[in-house]
């Protein structure tokens, strides 16, 4: 597919939950097929940031994330393709650069700076790094962690095309709140948007989503019961579910967001949350390289 091509060209696949015999019709929009590195929701959230950099001839891009950040991974790959210098400020310590996620970022040309968790959110510490870079190369474009801001949400609203606004529910995993905010804006009350937080104690996300969608109908709900202990946490139940789902539907899902969302959807269906007549569209947000991160950590 062409870079930043219309989301109307992306396949929608029917899926099944093995334990559900009588339930709604489930479909998944395969954003993961756009590209193995910067596909999924990431390319949409980065679209207008990239456009700004290219149109205004800004020298480079800088963003933030954890050592296994999907966002930094996608940004590094996209900047490599487009020939844009990029920088990442990473929450953690120097030894983290050996993990497969950051190894890819470094090989793709991203220059990495580490800030300890204690100082990662410090504007003072971040600005020290940013000022040093700008002294050397001039103005840079800064993207917030996860790519969630007005430009990111505008791009995320394009994950759905106009002719896909005929579903009863739209479902997505939630980390920073940008992608679900884009869905809420796009659907604009046509169907309900269901988000599944991948974070423990992620209730604060509701305030953020509300602020981004205050001019749109409150036709959404964020579930907090399927985080499995917190961000990037798994247990045997979730791992078994992931393997069974992948085998039954001939597609891969990521272990951070989609496995939890899909587990939640199956559980809600068992609890009769949906009508048998409902049509449910799930957004596949990519991020499959997270499997490598889990394998890496399992060996540590």
Predicted regions and their residues:
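PLP-dependent amino-acid enzyme catalytic core
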Residues: 1-300
